[in-house]
Curated annotation (Swiss-Prot):
Keywords on record: Autocatalytic cleavage, DNA damage, DNA repair, DNA replication, DNA-binding, Hydrolase, Repressor, SOS response, Transcription, Transcription regulation
MF annotations from Gene Ontology: DNA binding; serine-type endopeptidase activity
Protein name: LexA repressor
Protein family (similarity comment): Belongs to the peptidase S24 family.
Active-site residue numbers: S125, K162
CDD domains with a match to the protein in the record: HTH_ARSR, S24_LexA-like
Length: 201
């Protein structure tokens, strides 16, 4: 594409951005044509196709004014986090060590990208902490925890997601559901600490 066409394409792109910013909706093809001094609407369509091909805009040809600016930050770097079985957020179930799948998680979704894994939550014992049945819990691997941390704990080879409290002579794994009682233990193995939740709507 020659320089004049590139310049005109940039004019079209910048005009669309300006209109969306100022008015909240994109311009029509005729408005673009007039604003940037193109001779015909077919010339506008040519530039729109180029912008779409370059990933700068999205269009819906079945609708008028259906032009959307693609956020350049939407193409974010991701990390593939392993999904390790299914644990319970109710009664503990047998811990599953095999990796069932991997999940492409945006790298800016979590602070620490090392030693992460995900577990699918099953049950309602953590609903008052906003953790629902079917959520994917993002876990940072660690064998220690502070009071109040939500952890994945291993109890008799079974894993559970609970809030951790180290009392004077025992460990309390507290559900976030008033209808459920805490689990009291002399000791337990911490597998990891909750750092985030991913939920599909």
């Amino acid at each position: 594409m020659n320089k004049s066409r590139i310049d005109k394409q940039n004019e079209v792109y910048n005009f669309i951005k300006l209109q969306i910013k100022e008015k909240g909706y994109p311009p029509s093809v005729r408005e673009i044509c007039k604003a940037v001094g193109l001779s015909s609407t077919s010339s506008v369509h040519f530039h729109l196709k180029r912008l779409e091909k370059e990933g700068l805009i999205k269009r819906d040809s079945s609708k008028t004014r259906a032009i959307e600016i693609v956020d350049p930050t939407s193409k974010k770097e991701v990390i593939n986090v392993p999904i390790v079985g299914t644990i319970t957020a109710g009664n503990p179930i047998l811990a599953i060590e095999n990796i069932e799948d991997v999940f492409p998680l945006p790298i800016d979704y979590v602070k620490n990208t090392k030693d992460l894994f995900m577990l699918k939550v099953s049950g309602e014992s953590m609903i008052e902490a906003g953790i629902l049945d079917g959520d994917l819990a993002i876990i940072e691997k660690t064998d220690s925890a502070n009071n109040g941390d939500i952890v994945v704990a291993l109890i008799d080879n079974e894993a559970t997601l609970k809030r951790f409290f180290k009392e004077s002579s025992y460990i309390r794994l507290q559900p976030e559901n008033k209808s459920m009682k805490p689990i009291i233990l002399e000791n337990c193995k911490v597998l990891g600490r909750l750092v985030g939740i991913y939920r599909k709507y």
